[in-house]
Regions:
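Sec-dependent N-terminal signal peptides
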Residues: 5-15
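Sec/Tat signal peptide C-region and signal peptidase I cleavage site
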Residues: 15-21
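Cleaved targeting-peptide boundary
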Residues: 21-28
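A short beta-strand-turn-helix
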Residues: 30-51
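Thiol-based oxidoreductase modules, predominantly thioredoxin-like and allied folds used
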Residues: 32, 74-99
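Conserved redox-active cysteine motifs that mediate thiol-disulfide chemistry
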Residues: 56-72
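Structural alpha/beta surface segment adjacent to cysteine/selenocysteine redox centers
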Residues: 93-113, 122
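Non-catalytic, surface beta->alpha helical segment in thiol-disulfide oxidoreductase systems
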Residues: 110-164
Length: 168
């Protein structure tokens, strides 16, 4: 009888810990001032020769969490992003929909969540990426994600401007 009670307790404890782990993944700050965070990222990006990468989504969004897991756990992607971008996660939820701020970016939420934006060192939107094009099966296509980060980096944009005779 005691063994059954012990086993039942362990099973219930495991289930509870699993549920708690799922609830603690919070990559989006629902209280953040998106406009201030992006302005700070633009300033830092300008000083460091980078672009700004904005992830719009929420802690409620499984595809947002999957994307974050990919780019933070894949060492090559993590290094690529840190070397070329200032990253800002802009929350969209019932607690804080950031509607006014997202309007200044051209309503990127029209693509669903997550949606990604690349801003230049002056805060201008260079690219809005619908995440659907990066998805594969139940996750993301790593090569497509890497390609997006490579093609929209400040370095690549400067190289393109030099090669094709224009300026960014």
């Amino acid at each position: 009888m005691r063994l059954k009670a012990l086993v039942l307790s362990l099973v219930l404890c495991s289930i509870q810990m699993g549920l708690m782990a799922q609830q603690t993944v919070k990559i989006y700050n629902t209280e953040a001032d998106a406009q201030k965070e992006v302005a700070a990222a633009v300033s830092k990006a300008a000083n460091e020769g980078k672009h700004v990468f904005i992830e719009v989504g929420g802690n409620w969004c499984p595809w947002c969490l999957k994307f974050n897991k990919l780019i933070t756990e894949d060492a090559k992607l993590d290094s690529l992003i840190k070397a070329n971008y200032e990253v800002v996660r802009v929350n969209f939820s019932k607690e804080n929909d950031n509607h006014a701020f997202l309007a200044t970016l051209g309503y990127p939420q029209r693509f669903g969540y997550p949606v990604f934006l690349v801003l230049d060192e002056k805060g201008r939107v260079l690219h809005t990426q619908d995440s659907w094009y990066l998805e594969q099966d139940k996750g993301y296509n790593r090569e497509k994600v890497e390609h997006m980060f490579l093609m929209w980096s400040a370095f690549t944009m400067k190289e393109a401007a030099t090669k094709f005779g224009g300026s960014k």
